[in-house]
Amino acid sequence: MSQVHKHAIPSAIAEHALINPTQYQQYYQQSVQDPETFWGEQGKILDWIKPYSRVKNTSFDPGHISIRWFEDGTLNLAANCLDRHLAERGDQTAIIWEGDDPTQSKQVTYKQLHHDVCQFANVLKKLGVKKGDVVAIYMPMVPEAAVAMLACARIGAVHSVIFGGFSPEAVAGRIIDSNSKLVITADEGLRAGRAVPLKKNVDDALKNPGVKSITNVVVFQRTGKPGYWQEGRDLWWHELTAGVSADCPPEEMNAEDPLFILYTSGSTGKPKGVLHTTGGYLVYAAMTFKYVFDYHDGDVYWCTADVGWVTGHSYLLYGPLACGAITLMFEGVPNYPGVNRLSQVIDKHQVNILYTAPTAIRALMAEGDKAIEGTKRDSLRIMGSVGEPINPEAWEWYYNKIGNAKCPIVDTWWQTETGGFMITPLPGATELKAGSATRPFFGVQPALVDNIGTVQEGACEGNLVITDSWPGQARTLFGDHDRFEQTYFSTFKGMYFSGDGARRDEDGYYWITGRVDDVLNVSGHRLGTAEIESALVSHPKIAEAAVVGIPHNIKGQAIYAYITLNHGEEPTPELYTEVRNWVRKEIGPIATPDVLHWTDSLPKTRSGKIMRRILRKIAAGDTSNLGDTSTLADPAVVDKLLEEKQSMKVPS
């Protein structure tokens, strides 16, 4: 592979950093040797109604998977995100909203957000929503989505946020599984200038005979085009809130009371409703936000994630608001109306901290300098990456072009199920290597194990497991604790299995190699798809690549690569040969792709994750059952890939 560059901690960052290298070592040692004391102290980042005396009560033992943190403490999430800031920063901006249309933006102060949340919480109560009831939220990226989530938390209702990109079938499935009482939606969403028919999708979802629990649909007016309207069931947000009191005391919640359910996308069969509870989750979201982004008062922070993704829960809303931060919520996409939109938003709002996904970075990288045209981006101090391993070339481009070669990049590894960051750099404490998630956060004990569960020491490669609990950990899968144990704790007994593979280098840094089901076994050699994809994307003409294995009667598996070229590049037989030789040079002959499939776009979820399950089936010619494609941002991509596959002439 290409030479690994090491980036030192910039002196401008080191000078003011909340955590330095010595402190990282001290805190980390204490956090794993004496978690009771460490987390007992860190839990004070929140305001508790009744302080906890029990900190950690967890078991990863087979048949006894139980995760409880701060279990005798009580608190309210909305009070921690809003009320406690009013005296000192009531007039400070809480949310900067940037519309899909660049001419639309607004700022919401902590005082205003508190008012709107209390008012809407009273509306929910009037509609019969009680503590413990589940409320489905299917909203565009508007401040009212945050209001709805915080209002649920204020009264002790459990929210189940559903991606605005999900189909009616997916919405119905989640409503049925969670037994949601109410749906909160909008007439339409706006994305890249196009309307998204949210209300129509809800109408279609509610036609499913399995949906029996919904009493009302609350509709926020975004575009003024509601379409079908069912009197008695459908209610306008603005009519419900008119004249309603904004006095709503926060419900006292036990630390282990459920806070939200979030369904993980892309798996076949019944959706998995990951359940997070109140206390441990918020301690972890607030603490990871503060230290990983090195957040200082007054910093403008922008996480580009949708609220329907766990990143939107933990790092667009709850982590930042618990810390009294200024958080930017963006309705649009990074390349609309022009490919320099992301850079324009940074300049317009003087963003100091940017957190986005490799898929967005690679899309901008394919446009070259057009992505930064007419912008300075000199307000940026810290940048982050989330969602999948970032290949070193994209990392370096992000670092040099977007960040002007002065901003540390926190490449964060974590999952819906972990609640917050697990392996990540700290800006003032970690030297960076492009493409590495570096070291574990406080209290996180990763290990690499072989396929029979033997822990591997030193520099090695293996299955990434976590050997003990942390406060942000999901407690169960909603209504299915057996499946929770089966999915995460049965492969390697006594350990949480992430489903990812990783390697650890001689400095103890972790490199995520991709999902373990994305590991190829070519002639007995283990190859991570992320490694081959990195090599492909380092080719100057390639924008994006996804690699899967297909059955091969001699090698076991052959390498099938889907490739999107940069703007203006065309596939040719010469390029086909050149790309195969390129990978051969970068990794070795064993990693040479057997098949290159040129395509304009890959099947992705709204959160930007490539759906490899579908790519594997298309590559193998197994098109009989592609499974659930309703979670795709653009389901038409699948038909296009199938057509391309039919017409492919594979050079020998």
Curated annotation (Swiss-Prot):
GO terms for cellular component: cytosol. GO terms for molecular function: acetate-CoA ligase activity; AMP binding; ATP binding; metal ion binding. Mg(2+) binds at V537, H539, I542. CoA binds at R191, A192, G193, R194, T311, N335, S523, R584. The keyword Cell membrane does not apply. Pfam families: ACAS_N, AMP-binding, AMP-binding_C. InterPro entries: Ac_CoA_lig, ACAS_N, AMP-bd_C, AMP-bd_C_sf, AMP-binding_CS, AMP-dep_synth/lig_dom, ANL_N_sf. Its cofactor is Mg(2+). Belongs to the ATP-dependent AMP-binding enzyme family. This is Acetyl-coenzyme A synthetase. It comes from Serratia proteamaculans (strain 568). The lineage of its organism: Bacteria, Pseudomonadati, Pseudomonadota, Gammaproteobacteria, Enterobacterales.
